[in-house]
Swiss-Prot record:
EC numbers on record: 4.1.1.37
Protein's name according to its UniProt entry: Uroporphyrinogen decarboxylase
Gene: hemE
Source organism, top-level taxon: Bacteria
Enzyme class (EC, first level): lyase
Amino acid sequence: MLKNDLFLRALKRQPVPRTPIWVMRQAGRYLPEYRAIREKTDFLTLCKTPELAAEVTIQPVDIIGVDAAIIFSDILVVNEAMGMDVQIIETKGIKLTPPIRSQVDIDRLIIPDIEEKLGYVMDAIRLTKKELDNRVPLIGFSGAAWTLFTYAVEGGGSKNYAFAKKMMYREPQMAHMLLSKISQVITEYLLMQVEAGADALQIFDSWASALSEDDYREFALPYIKESVQAIKTKYPDIPVIVFSKDCNTILSDIADTGCDAMGLGWNMDIAKARKELQDRVCIQGNMDPTVLYGTHDKIKAEAAKILKQFGQHTAESGHVFNLGHGILPDVDPANLKCLVDFVKEESPKYH
């Protein structure tokens, strides 16, 4: 039994005494304890060494007091498992070779045996679960098909997604073939994470806002829905969070995927989101990560504003406090601790 299951209960929109909190990228460079480990190894080796991945996953639980842990990994491990060479240099960016731009390239990508190619993630989950000793839930995750598609086609990050969109508009069938292939791997990967012990799952669509509403409905949402439905069919009790960054105009479409919770970017009023969604799903978010550069008083004021905007909880509502994107690497850990402590103290009045 979990000692602290507030996060899971909030995702399922069950009554909780306060609002649970965790933050994206909470295991990361802002923590000196993380940097000490990173000095000895490169990023992907850290992801692939279960003992180290488990250690950094648990650091924010011990140091900051968050209500959930998220397994330390990277969304691009899926691309690598499919046969792409992935280089992640934290200060210089991301390079994937060869970029996938033709039918021949797509055919060359493999549908991997997940345990064989990504077994290190499952080992990290199993080890983390053991070491967490039921203190808090553990989140597994994957990138969404559209985001992993853009990395594959662009060969890295991109400002305008020219190659990805060229394939979408010139060769839509080819684009769907690649998206479908990636989606198949994502779904299997997420299911395996649950088998390894993940208590909840998050699907990150980091580049969601690159698409128009109609294109998002055609090239992104069907694949998210495919994964969500597969998870819900096999593991109906495992909550699924969808984070389609900055897709504020199609919230109800995202809710229609069958997800339990939706991550909200910081550029939308959480009250408006709740009103539109009518408590159909739990809302996760949505403080601007740069607020954590502010004074403790400013951090508390902004957190109080979000809690107040979300408003009083009902029998159907759910809110998990989070940032609208990942925590930035140069934030003072004391500022995050201030936020976490404040949300724990301030939120009970809304429950």
